[in-house]
């Protein structure tokens, strides 16, 4: 849980891009 929190608090560019892509996919295909 701690590592996940740290990743959310300090996401790398790659992690952020992947996160955004997942959201966009969810919006397109709910």
From Swiss-Prot:
The keyword Acyltransferase does not apply. One of its GO terms (molecular function) is toxin activity. It catalyses: Endohydrolysis of the N-glycosidic bond at one specific adenosine on the 28S rRNA. Expressed in seeds. It is an enzyme of class 3 (hydrolase). InterPro entries: Ribosome-inact_prot_sf. GO terms for biological process: defense response; negative regulation of translation. Keywords: Hydrolase, Plant defense, Protein synthesis inhibitor, Toxin. Coiled coil: none annotated. Its EC number is 3.2.2.22. The keyword Hydrolase applies. Belongs to the ribosome-inactivating protein family. Type 1 RIP subfamily. Exhibits N-glycosylase activity. Catalyzes the release of one adenine from a ribosome. Acts as a ribosome-inactivating protein and inhibits protein synthesis in a rabbit-reticulocyte lysate system and in various cell lines (in vitro). This is rRNA N-glycosylase.
